[in-house]
Amino acid sequence: MIDFISARIKLPRPLPVPVNGGLFVRFDEHGEVERTTALRKRVVGSHETALQIRAPGVHELEVTGNPVKFVQGHNLWGTSCPVTALWAAMVRLEALGALPVPLRALGLLGPSTLAESAEFSRVDCTAMLLADRWFDVETVLRSLRVAGRLRDRGASGLPYPWPESQGGGVTFGGRPGQSARHRQLVFYAKGKEVKVHPLPECIGDDPQLNEWLARCLRCEVRLGTNYLRKRGLRAPAMWTEERAGMEWTEMMERMDMNGSEERPEALAGLPPRLKAAYGAWLAGMDPQSIFPRSTFYDYRRDILKALAVDIAIPRQSEPSAEIVPFRRVIELRPAGRPDFADRIDALLASNG
């Protein structure tokens, strides 16, 4: 499903008047206007959800926010095509009177015209995985915080946990809240997130929905400007539902659980210097405090390649002889669109 989008639309026909939420004016020391910047205008859509729009000039329109949530009041399920999502949001903006003229008057006749005129600077592809029990989601998140890492991303591939007040999720590829110009992978418990950012009142207390959400692990792949440019994905015409699914799957496949697969044959072939560094890590020591900086990163790279173990992540302590360790397999499956989705959408429509 598509979540957050930032897009700039080059309008085939100009706007008759500016579209903004006011102006920021900067004066120099003599009181002369030095610069004027149009501010984003917040437009409230379905069930108090909002998009931000701004026209830097009469020939351009910027749209930022969650188009699926703006149109239907939630982002629990929805379209996986960013062009479809953006067009639906544009139609809603027109219906709300947020645009000075109809879309047709701007030369935007449908999704195909929009795809030819727009350019993306951020696209979030997301999906939810469903566990059998709510506490399985918390167990997976704890494991990701301790042992998760993004392959071949260096320090930015390490986990950055969220505060519990924000839902207790974890971000890979940059710190939480940091604008990602490349890619980020974000995990959080959807059941907790809807307590921080409540659902519309008409569905917020639905027991069937809340039980389902409590078992959902949200997995968001955030694609920034540099990545979209590198992959030729700034043009909406390059996007389909299949493309969004490919981007999500590719990023998820880069996720490793540090040291989850032991490879004794690879360990036997390590040079002595790498065995020493790996042995220090196994013993619970911090190799970064033992070796010079450049040496540590050389060792880290080579051990990561040979063993799929990142010695920059502290090793989990082994249980003592008095403790019998238990491991269990947690199965997560695609949540998809639940059986009761039509009922929830009908409630939202009747209370919209």
Question: Which residues are covered by each model-predicted region?
Answer:
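Structured, helix-rich domain cores that form ligand/interaction pockets
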Residues: 1-288, 309-352
